[in-house]
Amino acid sequence: MPHPMVAPALRRRRRSSFNPHVAAVMTGSILAGAMLSLSFIAVPVLLDTTTHPPQLFHKWSRLYHYGHVVLPSTAILTGLLYIYAAVCHHQRSSRSSLYLAGYGAQQS
């Protein structure tokens, strides 16, 4: 027979270590960093390295292509994580509008 203090601990359900609030903020931060790096780093480098219009157009189109592949899916994932965090929080309390407001501010 197990010790009386161990039995309640064994009956407790183990909580998941996944925190949707942290995941939403992290993916939003990564997305914001990626967009800022494109604006503040990649575009000036493109303009400094070449002035030949066809080559500049080719580099810009490749940069747009890579951003088009990655960034929209990251934005959708971030939005879904904010919604999931709001739903999880709403199940525990009634202040889920703060997370939805955070998602709305991040998308605008």
From Swiss-Prot:
Q: Name any one GO molecular function.
A: monooxygenase activity
Question: Which residue ranges run through the membrane?
Answer: 27-47, 67-87
Location of this chain's protein in the cell: Membrane
State its Enzyme Commission number(s).
1.10.3.-
Is Membrane there in the keyword field?
yes
Catalytic reaction equation(s): emodin anthrone + O2 = emodin + H2O + H(+)
What is the membrane topology listed in the Swiss-Prot or TrEMBL record?
Answer: Multi-pass membrane protein
Biotech use, in short, is: Secalonic acids show unprecedented anticancer activities against various human cancer cells and might be interesting for further derivatization, targeting diseases such as cancer.
Pathway participation? Secondary metabolite biosynthesis
Q: Which residues form a coiled coil?
A: none
Keyword annotations for this protein?
Membrane, Monooxygenase, Oxidoreductase, Transmembrane, Transmembrane helix
Q: Does the keyword Membrane apply?
A: yes
Q: What class of enzyme is it?
A: oxidoreductase
GO CC, sorted alphabetically, is: membrane
**Major subcellular site:** membrane
Q: What does this protein do?
A: Anthrone oxygenase; part of the gene cluster that mediates the biosynthesis of the tetrahydroxanthone dimer secalonic acid D. The pathway begins with the synthesis of atrochrysone thioester by the polyketide synthase AacuL. The atrochrysone carboxyl ACP thioesterase AacuM then breaks the thioester bond and releases the atrochrysone carboxylic acid from AacuL. Atrochrysone carboxylic acid is decarboxylated by the decarboxylase AacuI, and oxidized by the anthrone oxygenase AacuG to yield emodin. Emodin is then reduced to emodin hydroquinone by a yet unidentified oxidoreductase.
Give the record's family classification: Belongs to the anthrone oxygenase family.
Q: What is this protein called?
A: Anthrone oxygenase AacuG
Organism of origin is Aspergillus aculeatus (strain ATCC 16872 / CBS 172.66 / WB 5094)
> Per UniProt, what is the name of the gene that codes for the protein in this document?
AacuG
